[in-house]
């Protein structure tokens, strides 16, 4: 049948298109191609440091030149075509704003490779004109940004490979040609969910798809469209939710590599279907939130696996499986960072024929390594650290694995003589030995290096090794890291070790080493980065050779007996980040050249004998510290809060391989009753050019004025200049220290007033100007009124909150500290007080003797009663040595309770039995007590109390007991008995908001929106009262829904105010989360400064408000994975999905939906990442007031705002 004319025309057109596509393009002049390449060079290459494009010159190669085919990096097709077919400029260090127009105009260009340069800019201009012959494009490892335009490479119909990895691309997308086989967009900043979904929907022919290390969020799409994929990598993104059921079961048959590590995937995978994994060789599901009571048995179908990684899920538990024995191809098995328990199965040793790496670290495994592991003849890396293994398996089993290169057994319970000799004899290839944090003793073998010539790392910290450091360690020519800290070593540091040519880390702190530090540092190379030999007994001076070590990052010589001055030349150490010379006997001047160290963020010179003035040049590096991680080493910071008892603001330790409980025994900790320990893995990360963050020059003999230039250090968090002889005024420029958390200027001779600008320092949580000659009012703004009076003591000219009001004459005339008249009056007053006290003491002695005689007969009866107290509850009692405990009175603040005793509390709680226990938290256990008169109270028994700080406890209780407000839970009384501390509170019928919202089974009432609104405003009112109306002002420090209690009328009562500060003074080793609050409520800035502020309370209140709006918990792995409520809400708002935030039970009334959005807006303002942009609690109340103006209800009932206080009766508060 003849075709119709239109069809014939169309067929002819298609034929013509095919012919044109297949026919060679008409040749273009060589000069035109050269001009295009030169145009690219002019537009894109601003810097060519190595002259890589020097050959790009017309006429190069002589008269018969084939330019540009003879140019470096340019390849042409063979004759007769002869056109440019490839441009490869990879790794040439070229820099400039990339413009691809000219290159994409080359019609025969098939391969473009610009990998590993410094090109920047975006690709919005990159739109090749058809026909496009490109087959491979690689622009990876540059600095591109912006979004991918839809037109990017769109006309390239034969494109097979695109690599844009390791840039800064943020989103966008481009249509895939059906010919595409490989796409690598890894290590960018891609967050576009559309691009993610499009990548999975358009990957029909793609075999290699790598989207790892981006910012993709949401759920993982199905793989159904990716029928040809062999490698899929979406690791290290922000994806969440459960895994798609068919991810493996219906995966393409060719899939060999699947990596979803480092996301927030959750859910139980114990029954997950692995039916489609027959050809998988690599499976990595590590570092998610997956759970199972065993390793998923479905994995038995994946018998071709060569790599299986399930580390870091933390919820995988149970015994290690034995079915892995059948995995004959397995070469790497990593199950670290989970909750696996029990012994290591003997059967696992049977799969060792080919296994190269085995990582079972950070679980809860017990016992020893089975003898069957001696068969692991290919094993090179064995990591069993962070378990509870014991026994002599190192000598009997590990030492027989001759192929071993890395052995990591730290943080176990291995005891006995250190096994280095048998390891050296049996494992000659060892490069890494890590036996830290065990209980090994004995000496370090002297001939280690002759047996282990390849040894790179010797890590033996936190053991009980003794003897001396053998000089023969200097024969380990490849040794890079030595860590012998926290042992019992004595003697000198051998010069041979100092001379090691490749040494990077030399860490030997907390031993008994002595002598002088050899002055041969970096004499055989400049590789040394870490020199931490603090807290030994070194004498002599700081070696001058230290200034040759130009790669030094961390230097800690503190806690020794070094003398002399700091040698010149430190200013040359441009990589130096941490310098600790504190607690020595150093003298001379503080080196001004330290301000030339552009990376210096931590300078601690406290407790020496430095004299002279503070050099203004120290601030010279402000704004010069480059962005990025300054130090990636593990650290511990011991924050000192003991004032004059322990000098300095705190101590930073290198903390690799040390148990926290061992550190707690360290003299710097247990001699300081108010020291806190914080740990981390990085010291600081700057997003912009930064400055020093820690500067401690306290306890020296510095004189002169404080340089105003220190105010330029905008990232400074700790500044301690206390206990010197400084004079002059506090610089006004200190108001620019926007990151400051601790500022100590105490015990100097400063005069003048406190600059009002210091009130604007939102992070300031520790401020001490006591013992100076300051005058004038304490600024009423910001944090300054929240500090106790002791921080302003002995400045007789200061006034205002928390001191007496200005205009109030002090008892001895208000003369400045040191005034002769003032001293005479003080002496006279002291004599009178002394006489009166003597008389009083005599009277008390007579009364006490009489009482002792009367009570002696009943003591045994009373003691027997105490010993018979029930012990069925969780409470424990420390009453040894307490006389007459039952008759101890409860100090009360309410008249009806004035005759309450400890015996009454025992009776009302049945000896604090489990039946009366109604709750427990970070500060203690709470019991319900019904007194004889029928009244009901709640009794909190404090935990973490060490018996120290009696005066602080009493003073704090007396302060808290006087605070009365209808939205605060009143403290009715307190009792001290032995080492125990009891607090008596008013009982709240409906319990905590946390239970009512999140535990439906225990909740006594259901909260509708009107009730939640009432609670939101009531708790805000209580918090605002603490911040603005109490004297001194109080920071809550642990605001959360479990500290919002509900009374009979469902009125909110904020509880535990003042408790965090009290426990801060009593407990010596609280965790970071206890100090700062509760996870999920902690403001982001706390992890920079470890300081609590009123704006931190505002953030925590914002979380409570989100709980009321959403009904969700702040942290819930089943809802948010590794994210939290705040992060989830911010993501919902960003994606215009705010309606999904609200509790479904609140959205029934459409008329009230607009109000929910208004309350959500207030919550988001409270949760701003920048503290200075959060409202105060007074401003929050004002916003609530504004919302109520058009409302029929009046749940704010009379609330009014004055200049600085809250008043609920219409009269200005004190």
From Swiss-Prot:
| Active site, renumbered | 1038
Similarity comment: family membership: Belongs to the protein kinase superfamily. Ser/Thr protein kinase family.
Q: Where in the cell is it found?
A: Cell membrane
Residues annotated as binding brassinolide are 678
* Keyword Cell membrane applies: yes
Please name the GO terms that the record assigns under molecular function.
ATP binding; protein serine kinase activity; protein serine/threonine kinase activity; signaling receptor activity
Membrane topology, as annotated: Single-pass type I membrane protein
* PROSITE patterns referenced in this protein's UniProt entry, alphabetically: LRR (PS51450), PROTEIN_KINASE_ATP (PS00107), PROTEIN_KINASE_DOM (PS50011), PROTEIN_KINASE_ST (PS00108)
User: Is Cytoplasm a UniProt keyword of this protein?
Assistant: no
Q: Where is this motif: Cys pair 2?
A: 799-806
Q: Which residues cross the membrane?
A: 826-846
As recorded in Swiss-Prot or TrEMBL, the protein's gene is named BRL1
Which cellular component appears as one GO term in the record? plasma membrane
According to its UniProt record, which reaction does this protein catalyse?
Answer: L-seryl-[protein] + ATP = O-phospho-L-seryl-[protein] + ADP + H(+); L-threonyl-[protein] + ATP = O-phospho-L-threonyl-[protein] + ADP + H(+)
Keywords (A to Z) from UniProt: ATP-binding, Brassinosteroid signaling pathway, Cell membrane, Glycoprotein, Kinase, Leucine-rich repeat, Membrane, Nucleotide-binding, Receptor, Repeat, Serine/threonine-protein kinase, Signal, Transferase, Transmembrane, Transmembrane helix
Record remark on domains:
Contains two pairs of conservatively spaced Cys (Cys pair 1 and 2) possibly involved in forming some heterodimers.
Q: Which species is the source of this protein? A: Oryza sativa subsp. japonica (Rice)
- Motif Cys pair 1 extends across 69-76
Give me the residues that bind ATP, please: 918-926, 940, 986-988, 992-995, 1038-1043, 1056
The protein here is known as: Brassinosteroid LRR receptor kinase BRL1
Protein kinase domain boundaries: 912-1189
Q: What class of enzyme is it?
A: transferase
Residues spanning the signal sequence: 1-29
């Amino acid at each position: 049948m003849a075709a119709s004319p239109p069809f014939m025309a169309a067929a002819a057109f298609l034929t013509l298109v095919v012919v044109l596509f297949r026919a060679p393009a008409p040749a273009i002049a060589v000069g035109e191609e050269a001009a295009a390449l030169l145009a690219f060079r002019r537009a894109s290459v601003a810097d060519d440091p190595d002259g890589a494009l020097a050959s790009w010159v017309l006429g190069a190669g002589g008269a018969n030149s084939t330019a540009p085919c003879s140019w470096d990096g340019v390849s042409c097709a063979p004759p007769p075509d002869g056109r440019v077919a490839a441009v490869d400029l990879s790794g040439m260090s070229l820099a400039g704003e990339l413009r691809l127009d000219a290159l994409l105009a080359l019609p025969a260009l098939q391969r473009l490779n610009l990998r590993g340069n410094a090109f920047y800019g975006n690709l919005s201009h990159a739109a090749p004109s058809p026909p496009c012959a490109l087959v491979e494009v690689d622009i990876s490892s540059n600095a591109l940004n912006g979004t991918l335009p839809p037109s990017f490479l769109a006309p390239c119909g034969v494109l097979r490979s695109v690599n844009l990895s390791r840039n800064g691309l943020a989103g966008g997308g481009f249509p895939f040609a059906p010919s595409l086989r490989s796409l690598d967009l890894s290590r960018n900043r891609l967050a576009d969910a559309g691009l993610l979904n499009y990548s999975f929907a358009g990957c029909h022919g793609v075999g290699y798809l790598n989207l790892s290390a981006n910012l993709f969020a949401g759920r993982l799409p199905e793989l159904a469209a990716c029928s040809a994929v062999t490698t899929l990598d979406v690791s290290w993104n922000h994806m969440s939710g459960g895994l798609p059921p068919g991810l493996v079961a219906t995966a393409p048959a060719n899939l060999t590599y699947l990596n979803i590590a480092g996301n927030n995937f959750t859910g139980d995978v114990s029954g997950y279907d692995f039916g489609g994994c027959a050809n998988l060789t690599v499976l990595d599901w590590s570092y998610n939130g997956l759970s199972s009571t065993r390793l998923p048995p479905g994995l038995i179908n994946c018998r071709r696996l060569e790599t299986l990684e399930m580390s870091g899920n933390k919820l995988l538990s149970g015994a290690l499986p034995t079915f892995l024995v059948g995995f004959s191809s397995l070469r790497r098995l990593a199950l670290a960072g989970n909750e696996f328990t029990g012994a290591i199965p003997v059967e696992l040793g049977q799969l060792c024929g080919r296994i190269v790496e085995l990582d079972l670290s950070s679980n809860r495994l017990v016992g020893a390594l089975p003898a069957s592991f001696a068969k692991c003849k290919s094993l090179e890396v064995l990591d069993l650290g962070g378990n509870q293994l014991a026994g002599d398996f190192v000598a009997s089993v590990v030492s027989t694995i001759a192929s071993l290169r890395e052995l990591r057994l730290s943080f176990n319970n291995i005891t006995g003589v250190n096994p280095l000799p048998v390891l050296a004899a049996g494992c000659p290839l060892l490069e890494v030995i890590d036996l830290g944090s065990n209980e090994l003793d004995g000496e370090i073998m002297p001939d280690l290096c002759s047996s282990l010539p390849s040894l790179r790392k010797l890590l033996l910290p936190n053991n009980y090794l003794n003897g001396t450091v053998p000089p023969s360690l200097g024969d380990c020519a490849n040794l890079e890291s030595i860590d012998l800290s926290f042992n019992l070593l004595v003697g000198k540091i051998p010069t041979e070790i100092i001379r090691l040519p490749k040494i990077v880390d030399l860490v030997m702190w907390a031993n008994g080493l002595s002598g002088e530090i050899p002055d041969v540092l970096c004499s055989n190379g400049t590789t040394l980065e870490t020199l931490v030999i603090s807290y030994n007994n070194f004498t002599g001076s700081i070696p001058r050779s230290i200034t040759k070590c130009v790669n030094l990052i961390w230097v800690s010589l503190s806690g020794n007996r070094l003398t002399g001055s700091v040698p010149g030349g430190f200013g040359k150490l441009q990589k130096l980040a941490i310098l600790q010379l504190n607690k020595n006997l150093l003298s001379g001047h503080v080196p001004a050249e330290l301000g030339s160290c552009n990376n210096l963020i931590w300078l601690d010179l406290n407790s020496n004998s430095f004299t002279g003035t503070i050099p203004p040049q120290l601030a010279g590096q402000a704004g010069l510290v480059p962005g990025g991680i300054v130090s990636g080493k593990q650290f511990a910071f011991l924050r000192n809060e003991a004032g004059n008892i322990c000098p300095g603001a705190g101590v930073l330790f290198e903390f690799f391989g040390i148990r926290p409980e061992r550190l707690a025994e360290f003299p710097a900790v247990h001699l300081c009753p108010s020291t806190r320990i914080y740990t981390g893995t990085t010291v600081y990360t700057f997003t912009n050019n930064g400055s020093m963050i820690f500067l401690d020059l306290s306890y020296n003999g510095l004189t002169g004025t404080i340089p105003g230039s220190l105010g330029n250090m905008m990232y400074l968090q700790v500044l301690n200049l206390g206990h010197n002889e400084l004079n002059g005024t506090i610089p006004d420029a200190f108001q620019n220290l926007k990151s400051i958390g601790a500022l100590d200027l105490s015990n100097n001779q400063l005069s003048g007033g406190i600059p009002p600008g210091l009130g604007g320092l939102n992070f300031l949580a520790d401020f001490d100007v006591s013992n100076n000659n300051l005058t004038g009012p304490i600024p009423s703004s910001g944090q300054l009124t929240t500090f106790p009076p002791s921080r302003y003591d002995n400045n007789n000219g200061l006034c205002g909150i928390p001191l007496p009001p200005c205009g109030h004459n002090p008892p001895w005339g208000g003369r400045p500290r040191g005034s002769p008249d003032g001293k005479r009056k003080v002496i006279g007053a002291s004599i009178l007080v002394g006489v009166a006290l003597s008389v009083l003491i005599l009277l008390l002695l007579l009364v006490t003797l009489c009482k002792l005689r009367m009570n002696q007969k009943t003591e045994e009866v009373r003691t027997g009663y105490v010993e018979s107290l029930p012990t069925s509850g969780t409470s424990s009692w420390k009453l040894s040595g307490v006389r007459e405990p039952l008759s101890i009175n409860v100090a009360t603040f309410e008249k009806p309770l004035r005759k309450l005793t400890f015996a009454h509390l025992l009776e009302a709680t049945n000896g604090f039995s489990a039946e009366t226990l109604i709750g427990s938290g970070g500060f203690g256990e709470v019991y319900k007590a019904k007194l004889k008169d029928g009244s009901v109270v709640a009794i909190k028994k404090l935990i973490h109390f060490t018996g120290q700080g009696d005066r602080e406890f009493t003073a704090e209780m007396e302060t808290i007991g006087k605070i009365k407000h209808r939205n605060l839970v009143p403290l009715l009384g307190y009792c001290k008995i032995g080492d125990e501390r009891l607090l008596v509170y008013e009982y709240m019928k409906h319990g905590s908001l946390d239970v009512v919202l999140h535990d439906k089974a225990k909740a006594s009432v259901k909260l509708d929106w009107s009730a939640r609104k009432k609670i939101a405003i009531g708790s805000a009112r209580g918090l605002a009262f603490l911040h603005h109306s109490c004297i001194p002002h109080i920071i809550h420090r642990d605001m959360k829904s479990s500290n919002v209690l509900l009374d009979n009328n469902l009125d909110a009562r904020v509880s535990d105010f003042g408790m965090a500060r009290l426990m801060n003074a009593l407990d010596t080793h609280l965790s970071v989360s206890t100090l700062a609050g509760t996870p999920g409520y902690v403001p982001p800035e706390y992890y920079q400064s470890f300081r609590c502020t009123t704006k931190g309370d505002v953030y925590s209140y914002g979380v409570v408000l989100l709980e009321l709006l959403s009904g969700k918990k702040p942290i819930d792995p089943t809802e948010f994975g590794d994210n939290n409520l705040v992060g989830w809400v911010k993501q919902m708002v960003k994606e215009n999905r705010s309606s999904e935030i609200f509790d479904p039970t609140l959205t029934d009334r459409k008329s009230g939906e607009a109000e929910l959005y208004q309350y959500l807006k207030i919550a988001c303002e409270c949760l701003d990442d920048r503290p200075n942009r959060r409202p105060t609690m007074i401003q929050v109340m004002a916003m609530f007031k504004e919302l109520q103006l058009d409302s029929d209800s009046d749940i704010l009932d009379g609330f009014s705002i004055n200049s600085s206080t809250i008043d609920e009766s219409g009269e200005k508060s004190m």
